[in-house]
Amino acid sequence: MKIIIIGASGTVGRAVTEALSRRHDVIRVGRTQGDEQVDITSQASVQALFEKVGRVEAIVSASGGLYFGPLATMKDSDFNQGLQDKLLGQVRLALTGQHYLNDGGSITLISGIVAHEPIAHGVNATTVNAALEGFVRAAACELPRGIRINLISPTVLTESVETYDGFFPGFESVPAAAVAQAYRRSVEGVQTGLVYKVGY
């Protein structure tokens, strides 16, 4: 399969690229690195990416920024960061990318455990991740030509525990390699409209 991986240079993206590149033709995409570059907050950038890459069998996203901060001091501009990046950025990939997928192709997006287990300073993250679950479940009902869509929802990554020190007290972590296997299930499997929870 020809697979485009957005966010390929991140912790999850690197693991997913390693897992999928053994069997497939992978195009690595990042904001500033990779075979191609894209800004998922820009419709023009996303459109240009797909026009350049052409038709693919799978679109994989391991991308999306969020805002972490206390609700008491949060501004709408802070909250908008996660909406524009992880939520609308990935929705944009799906809405645009569907037209570049071959029949029977797939879209795999990423959310996270905070959709179900809120944390302190994580209001934006919980909102965005929960919204992505709703989008994937609904989109699966309407995508044509046998196109599938699923969502990967991992707990905190083992590789990122120190980075998010204090945000996930008592949460068990999971290595990125385990998350990559959930991506394989989505890309190489047959199911659609699912949330693949990893580590919880």
Q: Which ranges hold each PLM region?
A:
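Substrate-binding pocket helix/loop in short-chain dehydrogenase/reductase
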Residues: 70-71, 78-80
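Conserved NAD(P)H cofactor-binding loop of Rossmann-fold oxidoreductase domains
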Residues: 60-69
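N-terminal Rossmann NAD(P)H-binding glycine-rich loop of SDR-like oxidoreductase domains
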Residues: 4-19
